[in-house]
Amino acid sequence: MQVKTYLISKAVSYHELILEDGYINKIYIIDNPDREIYAIPDACLDLQFVYEKGRFVPYVCGTHTEVSLAFIGGSKKIFGVKFEPGVVPDFMKSYAGELVCTRRNVSDMEALSNIAVQFGKDMSFEDMADIFTSHFIYADYFKERKNIIVQIAGIIHNKKGCVTISDIAVQTGYNQRYLDRVFKESLGVSMKKYAGIIRIQKAIYYLQNNLTYEIYERLGYYDQAHFIKDFKKNTSLTPNKFGKVNSLSLIHI
């Protein structure tokens, strides 16, 4: 699933490379002339190399839980790596649950700092992407993938967010309270919140691909009013407004 994270003015330069390889969803770069950038909940963890004080500094950040100003709004240039929803690199597992709506400087990680020092302010996106993919070795960061968190996330994705906690418990064979506890400890949000984010992301996909016929029914909303309210809470726009703005290419997401 191609997740959408940012509401960005057309004055901001944004480019992305979609990977969707089971670990990394996409790589992206933002050149920002001091414009505000809003973040949409996406259920993902990001690794961002932010240009500040003449050098690139590595940060990790978690998902937002509602539409809000992104931390990168005041940064001139950002090279970002968005992991797949529900995927937690090994080095983040001890604190990933604390990253919701915040970010952490990880300059103390030698491997990431070694990548950062190879980036130049005027370097092209393609060159930066080549450097990152050459030095970020999956075997070093994803040694343990088969776990209950990945299983839960997979169920939620397959159901487009339209699944109850009790259904997940039945499919996994675990107690509901146990599942919700370990899921929140790992990702920082409850299974219910995570499912809600995935549902909105699916709605965005439908809107961007003109698959608008009875979206609210396909995504399990009570009625259209319920869908509109939830969509606006998560994106700041009504579905109709979002569709118009997107069709006019006034925003990059």
Regions found by a protein language model. Name each.
Residues 212-213, 228:
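Membrane-associated alpha-helical segments
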Residues 227, 231, 253:
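Conserved active-site tyrosine of GNAT-family acetyltransferases
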Residues 143-148, 155-156, 182-207, 230-247:
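Alpha-helical DNA-contacting segments of helix-turn-helix folds
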Residues 161, 208-210:
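Flexible coil/turn residues that form the inter-helical turn or adjacent wing/linker of helix-turn-helix
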Residues 168-176, 180-181, 194-198:
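Aromatic-anchored, glycine/proline-accented short structural segments
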Residues 1-149, 157-158, 165-166, 172-176, ...:
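Alpha-helical bundle regulatory/interaction domains
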